[in-house]
Amino acid sequence: MLTITSYFGFLLAALTITSALFIGLSKTRLI
């Protein structure tokens, strides 16, 4: 149970970092 929770937490963190990085890159290219 703990491994599944930590896995989903890691997946959510990776997704958030990727999306934030992608948005930052898009804003940089937009300007």
Swiss-Prot record:
The gene is petL. Keywords: Chloroplast, Electron transport, Membrane, Photosynthesis, Plastid, Thylakoid, Transmembrane, Transmembrane helix, Transport. GO terms for biological process: photosynthesis. GO terms for cellular component: chloroplast thylakoid membrane; cytochrome b6f complex. The chain crosses the membrane at residues 4-24. It holds the Pfam family PetL. Belongs to the PetL family. GO terms for molecular function: electron transporter, transferring electrons within cytochrome b6/f complex of photosystem II activity. The lineage of its organism: Eukaryota, Viridiplantae, Streptophyta, Embryophyta, Tracheophyta. Component of the cytochrome b6-f complex, which mediates electron transfer between photosystem II (PSII) and photosystem I (PSI), cyclic electron flow around PSI, and state transitions. PetL is important for photoautotrophic growth as well as for electron transfer efficiency and stability of the cytochrome b6-f complex. It comes from the Eukaryota. It is found in: Plastid, Chloroplast thylakoid membrane. It is a single-pass membrane protein. This is Cytochrome b6-f complex subunit 6. The 4 large subunits of the cytochrome b6-f complex are cytochrome b6, subunit IV (17 kDa polypeptide, PetD), cytochrome f and the Rieske protein, while the 4 small subunits are PetG, PetL, PetM and PetN. The complex functions as a dimer. HAMAP family: Cytb6_f_PetL (MF_00433). It comes from Solanum tuberosum (Potato).
